[in-house]
């Protein structure tokens, strides 16, 4: 079984096993390449623009963080509680399952390596109707600086959801 297929199965049946921090989820995403840009679209229903952060790390990794505090799952684990079985302080309600995206505090995180021709410093993002669109223009005839190049033996593109 290929590594990609293994990770797909792990992501579907054991969230967090495929390189994602416990308590975080990956949003569904589309990536299309046009003659002038790479365009990424992610479904983030129920989130406002100020609840989403888009950043480029090390000049070639696009990272999107959305939703609640990223420390919530770690804090619950330290307190000895499962994240889905926390008791609400204000009304004494105990949740046994919280899977709906709208209004939950779980964070959504995804990150992946941008292609060699991506001009990450010129990237733009917009949010409309629960869909985040990130547009990264292509460089004309130029590639990234040598210091940000591919690792030795790494000549295949990396898919958006399976990069560790």
Curated annotation (Swiss-Prot):
One Gene Ontology biological process: response to heat
InterPro entries: A-crystallin/Hsp20_dom, HSP20-like_chaperone, Small_HSP
Chief location: cytoplasm
Molecular functions per Gene Ontology: unfolded protein binding
Domain sHSP: 20-154
Segments of this protein annotated with the region Disordered: 68-93
Compartments (UniProt record): Cytoplasm
Record's note on what induces expression: By heat shock.
GO cellular component: cytoplasm
Record keywords, A-Z: Cytoplasm, Stress response
Quaternary structure and partners: May form oligomeric structures.
Protein name in the entry: 17.8 kDa heat shock protein
Gene: HSP17.8
């Amino acid at each position: 079984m290929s590594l990609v297929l293994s990770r797909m199965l792990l992501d579907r049946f054991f969230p967090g096993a495929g390189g994602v921090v416990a308590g975080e989820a990956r949003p569904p995403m589309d990536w299309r390449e046009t003659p002038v840009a790479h365009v990424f679209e992610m479904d983030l229903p129920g989130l406002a623009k100020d609840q989403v952060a888009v950043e480029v790390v090390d000049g070639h990794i696009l990272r999107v963080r959305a939703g609640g505090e990223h420390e919530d799952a770690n804090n619950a684990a330290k307190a000895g509680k499962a994240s889905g079985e926390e008791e609400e302080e204000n009304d004494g309600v105990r949740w046994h399952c919280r899977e709906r995206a709208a209004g939950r505090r779980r964070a959504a995180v995804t990150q992946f390596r941008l292609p060699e021709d991506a001009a990450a410093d010129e990237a733009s993002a917009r949010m409309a109707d629960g869909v985040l669109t990130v547009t990264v223009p292509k460089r004309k005839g130029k590639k990234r600086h040598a210091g940000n190049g591919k690792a030795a033996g790494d000549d295949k593109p990396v898919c958006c959801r399976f990069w560790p």
